[in-house]
Amino acid sequence: MFLQFYLNENGERVYTLKKVDPSGQPTSSAHPARFSPDDKFSRHRVTIKKRFGLLLTQQPRPVL
């Protein structure tokens, strides 16, 4: 059994152990992908994120 989630009407995550949500749509895994030090494509992902300004260092500081 793995933790799954689906989005409700308000766009909030609802966590469940079921494979389908109440409307019959499949749920998504709530676990992140495994990290591998042998990842051949990490350089490409970082390049794409840098190009589109998605890196955390390119985001404005959060207001506390």
Curated annotation (Swiss-Prot):
Quaternary structure and partners: Component of the small nucleolar ribonucleoprotein particle containing H/ACA-type snoRNAs (H/ACA snoRNPs). Component of the telomerase holoenzyme complex.
Ribonucleoprotein recorded as keyword: yes
Functional note: Required for ribosome biogenesis. Part of a complex which catalyzes pseudouridylation of rRNA. This involves the isomerization of uridine such that the ribose is subsequently attached to C5, instead of the normal N1. Pseudouridine ('psi') residues may serve to stabilize the conformation of rRNAs.
Gene3D superfamilies from the UniProt entry: H/ACA ribonucleoprotein complex, subunit Nop10
Any Pfam family the entry gives: Nop10p
UniProt-listed InterPro entries: H/ACA_rnp_Nop10, H/ACA_rnp_Nop10_sf
Subcellular location: Nucleus, Nucleolus
Family the entry assigns: Belongs to the NOP10 family.
Protein name: H/ACA ribonucleoprotein complex subunit 3
Chief subcellular location: nucleus
Keywords tagged on the record: Nucleus, Ribonucleoprotein, Ribosome biogenesis, rRNA processing
Organism this protein belongs to: Danio rerio (Zebrafish)
One Gene Ontology term of the molecular function aspect: snoRNA binding
PANTHER family assigned to the protein according to its UniProt record, in alphabetical order: H_ACA RIBONUCLEOPROTEIN COMPLEX SUBUNIT 3 (PTHR13305:SF0), RIBOSOME BIOGENESIS PROTEIN NOP10 (PTHR13305)
Keyword NAD: no
GO biological process: primitive hemopoiesis; rRNA processing; rRNA pseudouridine synthesis; snRNA pseudouridine synthesis; telomere maintenance via telomerase
Span list, region Disordered: 19-40
GO CC terms in record: box H/ACA snoRNP complex; telomerase holoenzyme complex
